[in-house]
Every structure is written in C-alpha cells, then in structure tokens.
C-alpha cells in the first residue's frame, strides 16, 4: 500500500468513526423530543422483533412530545408496552390510534449522569481515532521497511496523519460540548 493510499484510507476511516459517534449521540436523551430516541426500542411483530420505525410512523408532535402512529390498528398496545418497558424512562399514552410519548423533565442528577455518558462516548471515539492513527503509522513504517517509501516521506506522512487526527479530535470535543450543553439546558 502506498503512502497516499494509507493517508486516504485512514482519513476515510476517521470520518466513519465521527459519523458513528454522531449516531451514538442521537440515542442519548436530551430535554427535547427526538424521534431517533425510539430507534433502540423493538416491538414484537408477528414473532419478529422489529424497531418501532418499521411498524409505525414516528414523528414530533411538539418540542417535548413524540407521536407514534402504528400502521396496523392492533399494534398500538404492543408499541405502547415496548416503549414503557424500555429503559428510557418514558410513559406513553394512547389516544385512539395515536400514541403520544411526552418527554419528562430530567432531574439535575440525571442531566449530570447523561453528561458523563456523553464524555465517555467522546473518549471512546477519541481512542478509536488514535488507534487508527497508530495503525496508519505502523503501515507507513512497514512501507519504509519494504522500501516502498523514503524516511522523509514517512516523517511527512506521519505529520499529516497527526494533523488529521488532531482535526478529528477537535470535532469530537465540539460534538461532546454541544451535546453536554443540550443536556444541561433546562
């Protein structure tokens, strides 16, 4: 693998790590309603456990309420039970064929707890980025050892990869700060 290929590959993988981190952040509850919050909740649909989004229309009713509109009449009670039994601390209420899921206000203690979870997720993402940097640097050293690149190219490439790593770590820090601010907002 050439030096340029190594640099492009590591940058692509770092971008994927950032996207995965962003996806993980959407699952962490803030004070506002977010339909993605119910992505982790699965409901029994004729023997198969499916995400709610595959058996109902999930949307926002207002800033603090998620509405779930089942596609089949008989699924309302099952969806309501699945949401109630999830560990999200939500209490859905059924209004005919529409299920309303109000978001309860979080206590200060719960906000701090979620803030710690966000920081932990951020640290995990940074570790993933650093591991990618380490793997890329090892691949570069191997290329130099196999006489596919010079030592000058190695130093230049390692510097470039460090800059890319620093950029991605800054993005993670910004995402963590924004999510913490979102969580701590009353």
Swiss-Prot record:
Gene: frr
Gene source species: Albidiferax ferrireducens (strain ATCC BAA-621 / DSM 15236 / T118)
Statement: the UniProt record of this protein carries the keyword Cytoplasm: yes
GO MF term set: ribosomal large subunit binding
Ranges that cross the membrane: none
InterPro entries linked: Ribosome_recyc_fac (IPR002661), Ribosome_recyc_fac_dom (IPR023584), RRF_sf (IPR036191)
Name the UniProt record assigns to this protein: Ribosome-recycling factor
Location in or out of the cell: Cytoplasm
Keywords: Cytoplasm, Protein biosynthesis
Function of the protein: Responsible for the release of ribosomes from messenger RNA at the termination of protein biosynthesis. May increase the efficiency of translation by recycling ribosomes from one round of translation to another.
Major localization class: cytoplasm
Family stated for the protein in its record: Belongs to the RRF family.
HAMAP family registered for this protein in UniProt: RRF
